[in-house]
From Swiss-Prot:
PANTHER family: LRR RECEPTOR-LIKE SERINE_THREONINE-PROTEIN KINASE GHR1, OS07G0626500 PROTEIN. InterPro entries: Inactive_SerThr-Kinase_ABA, Kinase-like_dom_sf, Leu-rich_rpt, Leu-rich_rpt_typical-subtyp, LRR_dom_sf, LRR_N_plant-typ, LRR_R13L4/SHOC2-like, Prot_kinase_dom. LRR repeats lie at residues 73-93, 94-119, 121-141, 142-165, 166-189, 191-212, 213-237, 239-260, 262-285, 286-309, 310-333, 335-357, 358-384, 401-425, 426-449, 450-474, 476-498, 499-521, 522-546, 548-570, 572-592. The modification Phosphotyrosine is found at residues 406, 1047. It comes from Arabidopsis thaliana. Residues 1-18 form the signal peptide. The modification Phosphothreonine is found at residues 280, 415, 669, 675, 713, 720, 764, 928, 1010, 1045. Changing residue 63 to D: In ghr1-12; apoplastic ROS-sensitive plants exhibiting increased tissue damage when exposed to ozone (O3). Slightly higher steady-state stomatal conductance. Receptor kinase acting as an early component in abscisic acid (ABA) signaling. Required for darkness, ABA, high CO(2) and hydrogen peroxide (H(2)O(2)) induction of S-type anion currents in guard cells leading to stomatal closure, possibly via the phosphorylation and activation of the anion channel SLAC1 and as a scaffolding component. Seems to act in parallel with SRK2E/OST1 in the ABA signaling pathway which regulates stomatal movement. Binds ATP. Involved in the local and/or systemic stomatal responses (e.g. stomatal closure) to light stress. Keywords: Abscisic acid signaling pathway, ATP-binding, Cell membrane, Glycoprotein, Kinase, Leucine-rich repeat, Membrane, Nucleotide-binding, Phosphoprotein, Receptor, Repeat, Serine/threonine-protein kinase, Signal, Stress response, Transferase, Transmembrane, Transmembrane helix. GO terms for biological process: abscisic acid-activated signaling pathway; cellular response to absence of light; cellular response to carbon dioxide; positive regulation of abscisic acid-activated signaling pathway; regulation of stomatal closure; response to abscisic acid; response to light stimulus. The lineage of its organism: Eukaryota, Viridiplantae, Streptophyta, Embryophyta, Tracheophyta. This is LRR receptor-like serine/threonine-protein kinase GHR1.
């Protein structure tokens, strides 16, 4: 009996012990404590010590997988968790096989004891916010089969110990900030099936030995800085089926690209490198491939015949230097399975025969030198781009084309009228015939012949006659481009409702009459351009109903009456000048600069106190009242004298208070109008910074309270305006002057998280708080400081304005991509700070001295040094083009904010480096729109960006901005200055175009350069060549060359 009692007690005791928290449970509960945010409650509502199984494993907890009494798996993917993760806790889970927490907002570092996870086979921490370097002990995790750390901010080199992961089958470390050479030890991972190290900053040569990994199926190294020669042995011997080494710096030394390609490779991408030579005439390079992408290289010669190539499905050879004719085999219907063919951006010539292939869906032959008439047949083509060639003839051949949905024939030499015969393009949704020589009128049956049309562009031809009656009422149309023709008649009729039209451009035609009163029915309209017509009457009040309108231009017409009282608050571009409008400008339009309203509109009045109202009055009455000019000039002179007297008074006061201090003069940017020569005549130049300041208001309206206090310490170049033209990054201040600090309230004010993109800087938030910080300037997205660290190192700190930055996770993922950007002509970003409040977002980058291009170029008070010589200016232009070429082709990102103040000159040699790049990727849509709007006011915005409600920077908009900068370099003038004189209020680009069109292009050059040009014919030739390049850069987007071409052309001068 006693023995039975003992047994029962023992069983009860063991049962009770089973309910005690195990080592596994304690580790999980400790991890739970680090979770700051769990939007779904998946973890916080489930993990508790009251729901534990009898065997001691919490299998009822969400995301937990048990094996017996032990935790075997923790799966917390895609939950939006925010946590400071301590992964060393999981070393206590001795039977853990799978740990997966991808796509959250987890931060922290990998533990040094990662190698003690003896049973771990699957580790996925991708798409989080982890940082720091990889621990050397990671190579001791010999049981790991799958390791994914992609989409984080890991930095430093991959440790050689990675070669110890002998069981590894899949390794993904893409989209991090890893750098250094690829370790040779990776080639010893004999079981590896998948290797992805793309979008990092790896340098050096690709190690030999990857071809010896017999199991390797996928090798992805794209988006790094790997250099050296293509390894022909790898391509011949590898067993991989997918190879992507695009976006690196690989070169070739022999005349042939490769001696051959392994039969196992099906997908090969070597685009965006520096490969030269020609393609082999044999078929061994292509016979087993399904996808081949060699675009954006420097390959040349004629294309091979592509005989006996049966498996190729995608062939991309765009933007190289191929010449000769187009191989007919590529367009046959019986020799290839080709679905996509892109040969654009080469030097191919000759005609294009009929396209017989029934499998070819996408054919891009744009930007070549192809001639002849259109092909008779297009086979199964759905997308056909033949733009920017030398095709001629009429358009009647397309009557037999059946499957086309996207057709671009722009920038050719087509003549005749728009076909009226019934075509087969019933599926067409995009039709671009711009920049040809088409004549006649548009047929009335367009809506029935093209029932699915969304985009119609027939701009820049010689069309006549009215708009077809039902065209504007087509239910599918979203964009209509009819500008730059000779069309006549009234505009209309318009649909009463249901219109999808987002863009309507009828500018530079001969339309007349009144606007339809039902204009407000175009409720989706975002861009409306009716400029340079003969329209009259009043602007219909129904325009107030177009709430999505972001760009409105009705200038150069004969409109009368008042402006609509309540136009859309989304309008970012506005121009009603050269009309006969009257009344008072509505309050919601008063912040647009005077050139939006004047010249013309002599009876139109800006509200009292509106920015620039005095300037507008001067402009409005200029042609009829010369007395006003005199008054303005005298007023400016008096104001200037007063400013000088005030400056002298302040100087005396400062000197009396602190004799040892030197007066800081010349620090305030001149905000007044300046009189400079305009060609052969004088003229007034209105600074674009004034327009930005007018639109923004005072600095207090855009700065956080902390920034206001920093500015108030005396380092703001202006306390009355939002500065968009800063004096440059090289401004210096007396050492004994009281410096502004980032910690304007207390030394420990920065209490958030400071992340660095590499290991070159070690700094805490508190140390950054203590750093003296001089204000360099302000822009639409924040304030820039020069911070002096304790070790004497300078950093540029950009304090982002409240509300412009994206959410933390997206911001962090984007900013870490910058760590891969390393180039002598690009300013290096070092890190970022994320504070606990909305206005505490900082970006840290290298400080560049002596200053910006603007501070050396413009003839303004405080200009640094003597005027730049031609050799210096040309070198700066080449440097900037080289930096942009790197961003576009090596990093595949547009700059997005290119202007003279963002080109910094480094050292005594004035090496140019572009700064403030890719900020649009860190900002909200509103922040991006505001940045682009400022670029428009300052003269750098590409015209196409005004045609989008949600504009985003692009490669082509960068080229436009670079063209404007070239004009600044040539003229010495600021892009945003409004130049008046012989012409009425034109900006820099229009002024240069006018001079060139009149055969007076040489009058545009800076007087300093003109003196050099007169004594050196080589200089004169170079300046004229750069002027030609600049004019190409500011063409319409479809005619604009890529930066690669521009860089090569500039380098050859």
């Amino acid at each position: 009996m006693n023995l039975s009692r003992i047994l029962l007690l023992s069983m009860f005791f063991l049962s009770a012990m089973g309910q005690l928290p195990s080592q596994d449970i304690m580790a999980l509960l400790e991890f739970k404590k680090g979770i700051k945010h769990d939007p779904t409650g998946f973890v916080l509502n489930s993990w508790n010590d009251e729901s534990i199984d009898f065997n001691g494993c919490p299998s009822s907890w969400n995301g937990i997988v048990c094996n017996g009494g032990n935790v075997a798996g923790v799966v917390l993917d895609n939950l939006g968790l925010t946590a400071d993760a301590d992964f060393s806790l999981f070393s206590n889970l001795t039977k853990l096989v799978k740990l997966s927490m991808s796509n959250n907002s987890l931060s922290g570092v990998l533990p040094n004891d990662l190698g003690s996870f003896k049973s771990l086979q699957f580790l996925d921490l991708s798409d989080n916010l982890f940082s720091s370097s990889l621990p050397k002990e990671i190579g001791r995790s010999v049981s790991l089969r799958n390791l994914s750390l992609s989409g984080n901010n890991f930095s430093g080199e991959i440790p050689e110990s990675m070669g110890g992961l002998i069981s590894l089958q899949s390794l993904d470390m893409s989209s991090n900030s890893l750098s250094g050479p690829l370790p040779k030890s990776l080639t010893r991972l004999n079981d590896l099936l998948y290797l992805n190290l793309s979008s990092n900053g790896f340098t050096g040569k690709m190690p030999r030995g990857f071809e010896l990994i017999s199991s390797l199926e996928v090798l992805d190294l794209h988006g790094n800085s790997i250099d050296g020669n293509l390894d022909g042995e790898f391509f011949l011997l590898t067993n991989a089926s997918y190879v992507d080494i695009s976006g690196n710096r690989l070169v070739t030394t022999s005349g042939k690209l490769l001696p051959g390609v392994s039969e196992s490779i099906k997908h090969l991408n070597l685009s965006h490198n520096q490969l030269e030579g020609s393609l082999t005439s044999g078929f061994q390079l292509f016979q087993n491939l399904k996808v081949l992408d060699l675009s954006y290289n420097m390959l040349s010669g004629e294309l091979p015949g592509f005989n006996y190539v049966y498996d190729l499905e995608v062939l991309k050879l765009s933007n190289n230097r191929f010449s000769g004719s187009l191989p007919n085999n590529l367009l046959k219907g019986d020799s290839l399975l080709l679905t996509t063919l892109d040969l654009s951006g080469n030097n191919l010539s000759g005609p294009v025969s009929s396209i017989m292939s029934t499998t070819l869906h996408t054919l891009d032959l744009s930007s070549n030198s192809l001639t002849g008439e259109l092909p008779l047949l297009t086979g199964g083509c759905v997308l056909l781009d033949l733009s920017n060639n030398q095709f001629e003839g009429n358009l009647t051949r397309w009557s037999k084309w059946e499957n086309i949905e996207y057709l671009d024939l722009s920038q050719n030499h087509f003549t005749g009228s728009f076909p009226d015969a019934t075509p087969q393009l019933l599926r067409a949704n995009h039709l671009n015939l711009s920049y040809n020589k088409l004549t006649g009128s548009l047929p009335e049956r367009i809506p029935t012949h093209y029932p699915k049309l969304r985009v119609l562009d027939i701009s820049s031809n010689s069309l006549e006659g009215p708009i077809p009656g039902a065209l504007l009422s087509m239910p599918t149309l979203e964009e209509i481009h009819l500008q730059n023709n000779g069309m006549t008649g009234n505009i209309g009729p318009l649909p009463s409702s249901g219109s999808r039209i987002r863009l309507l451009d009828l500018s530079h035609n001969r339309f007349d009459g009144d606007l339809p009163g039902v204009f407000g029915s175009l409720t989706n309209l975002q861009v409306l351009n009716l400029a340079a017509n003969n329209l009259s009457g009043s602007l219909p009040s129904s325009m107030n109903d177009i709430v999505s309108l972001s760009s409105l231009d009705v200038s150069q017409n004969h409109f009368t009456g008042p402006l609509p009282s309540n136009l859309s608050s989304n309008i970012m571009a506005f121009n009603v000048s050269y009309n006969d409008l009257s009344g008072t400008v509505p309050e919601n339009l008063k912040n647009f600069p005077p050139p939006s309203f004047y010249p013309g509109n002599s009876k139109l009045v800006l509200p009292a106190g509106s920015p620039g109202s005095s300037a507008s009055e001067a402009s409005k009455n200029k042609s009829t009242n010369k007395l006003v000019k005199v008054v303005i000039i005298v007023s400016c002179a008096v104001a200037l004298i007063i400013l000088i007297l005030v400056a002298i008074l302040l100087f005396c006061i400062c000197k009396s208070r602190r004799r040892e201090e030197r007066s800081i003069t010349g620090k305030e940017t001149n905000r007044r109008a300046q009189t400079i020569p305009s060609g052969s005549g004088g003229g007034m130049v209105v600074s674009a910074e004034d327009l930005v300041a007018s639109r923004k208001g005072s600095s207090s309206e855009i700065l956080s309270p902390d920034e206001k206090l920093a500015v108030a310490t005396g380092f703001s170049p202006s306390k009355t305006s939002n500065l968009s033209w800063s004096p440059g990054s090289g401004d210096s201040f007396p050492a004994d002057q009281q410096l502004a600090r980032l910690d304007v309230r207390s030394p420990d004010r920065l209490v958030g998280e400071l992340h660095f993109l590499d290991d070159s800087i070690k700094l805490t938030p508190e140390e950054l708080s203590r750093a003296p910080a001089e204000v360099l300037g302000r822009s639409s997205h924040g304030t820039s400081y020069r911070a002096t660290l304790d070790n004497g190192v300078f950093l540029t700190v950009k304090w982002l304005r409240e509300g412009v930055a994206k959410q933390r996770k997206e911001f962090a993922k984007e900013v870490k991509k910058f760590s891969n950007i390393r180039h002598p002509n690009v300013v290096t970003l070092r890190g970022y700070y994320w504070g606990p409040t909305q206005h505490e977002k900082l970006i840290l980058s290298d400080y560049i001295s002596p200053g910006s291009l603007a501070s050396f170029l413009y003839d303004r008070p405080g200009r640094k040094g003597p005027p730049l010589a031609w050799t210096q200016r040309l070198k700066i232009a080449v440097d900037v083009a080289r930096g942009l070429n790197y961003l576009h082709f090596d990093r595949a990102v547009p700059h997005g904010n290119l202007k003279a103040t963002n080109i910094l000159l480094d050292g005594a040699e004035l090496n140019a480096r572009v700064a403030d790049y890719c900020l649009h990727r860190l900002m909200t849509q509103a922040g991006t729109v505001e940045q682009i709007l400022d670029a428009g006011i300052l003269g750098y915005r590409a015209p196409e960006l005004a045609a989008s409600r949600k504009p985003l920077p692009s490669f082509k908009s960068d080229v436009y901005a670079f063209g404007v900068i070239l004009l600044e370099i040539l003229t010495g003038r600021c892009a945003g200055d409004v130049i008046t004189g012989e012409q009425e209020g034109v900006d820099l680009t229009d002024w240069v175009r006018l001079r060139v069109a009149e055969g007076r292009g040489a009058e545009c050059f800076d007087s300093v350069l003109t003196q050099e040009m007169g004594s050196d014919p080589v200089t004169e030739k170079g300046m004229k060549e750069v002027l030609g390049i600049a004019l190409r850069c500011i063409r319409s987007v479809s005619e604009r060359p890529g930066i690669k071409t521009i860089y090569e052309d500039l380098s050859s001068i």
